[in-house]
Regions:
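C-terminal accessory extensions appended to soluble enzyme cores
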Residues: 119-142
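Amphipathic alpha-helical recognition patches that constitute DNA-binding helices
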Residues: 66, 115, 123
Length: 142
């Protein structure tokens, strides 16, 4: 987590282990001076988008393992919806690449898929299932 992230101080100086950080990320911080809800509540405002015809869901794994094809599909989706690119397709793809540069993200850690398996304990898995409900299903992961 970048030191400019709003919750950096808490994660870096109050929480002392990866286990505590994962638990806090799942449960949120109801007492925090800066809003930080549980994992389900953080996703809830966006779940309705999945029901919209004009929305193209994109998962992190596709951006990592099939980046070029995924970015091309995103452009195809925009154009199919009537959007006219103001530049060449190649330039638009370059713009997309810059926009998803992980080094510019305050929450970027490693940029690899499946790493959660290395850190989630059985307790984390159970807690995540309890708090998130059907979130993984709605996002297409189960």
């Amino acid at each position: 987590m970048a030191n400019t992230h709003v919750h950096h101080e808490y994660y870096a100086h109050v929480l002392s282990s990866m286990e505590e950080r994962i638990t806090t990320s799942i449960l949120g911080r109801p007492d925090a001076p800066i809003e930080f809800p549980d994992i389900r509540a953080r996703f809830e405002p966006y779940l309705g988008w999945l029901e919209q015809d004009f929305v193209m869901p994109v998962c992190f794994e596709d951006l990592i393992h099939n980046r070029q094809r995924t970015l091309e599909r995103m452009l195809d989706h925009l154009e199919a919806g009537g959007y006219r690119l103001p530049t060449s397709r190649e330039r638009a793809l370059e713009t997309f690449e810059r926009a998803i540069d992980p080094t510019r993200s305050p929450t970027f850690r490693e940029g690899k898929t499946g790493a959660w398996r290395e850190h989630f304990t059985a307790e984390h898995r159970a807690l995540f299932a309890q708090v998130s409900g059907d979130l993984l299903q709605r996002l297409g992961y189960e």
